[in-house]
Amino acid sequence: ESGKRMSVLEQDHSLFDSNSVLETVIMGDISLYQIKKEIDSLYENYSDENAEKIGSLQVKFEEMDGWNAESNAASLLSNLGIKESLHQTQMNDIDPKLKVRILLAKSLFGNPDVLVMDEPTNDLDYETITWLEDYLANFDNCIIVVSHDRHFLDSVCTHISDIDFGKINHYSGNYTFWYESSQLAARQRAQQNKKAEEKKKELE
């Protein structure tokens, strides 16, 4: 949908190796990041000719809450266990397990309209998972998550889509509701199949 922004939890941990940790997180909102870079570039080559363009870009930047971008990114990083001393470090110098947390912060940055996450709790400790669960529980927009963490799904999900034998079934509820409902449906199918077999034998 036009005007909506989708954010995806990156799986390629080397994709941002030439960027700093803080810069990587801000790149979660690529439009904001590009405006920021353009403003910086125009200031480096400042002239009367580009002053008007700088002013126009700064208006857009303010509308996107750009002046708070670094502090918002830093807050996400700190909540995900990334020390402030690492925020200006290049990504290629970061421990791979910490990169997971940084890319998670990137996906959350800027309150995207649609957030897509594949196994977001991998390599996270209990404290960080608990923080993420609380954060997502208060997230107002759409979240699409794939996870094998049952407790996480129970805490975060309000709807479950189950893909089984090429068919998609949708359930309104968390993981426990889906599990109980799917088990009940499986038992009912088994009973129906049994009755059908018994009736078939009677007719033979």
Where are these regions (language model features)?
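ABC ATP-binding cassette signature C-motif
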Residues: 1-194
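Short cytosolic helices in intracellular loops of multi-pass membrane proteins
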Residues: 194-204
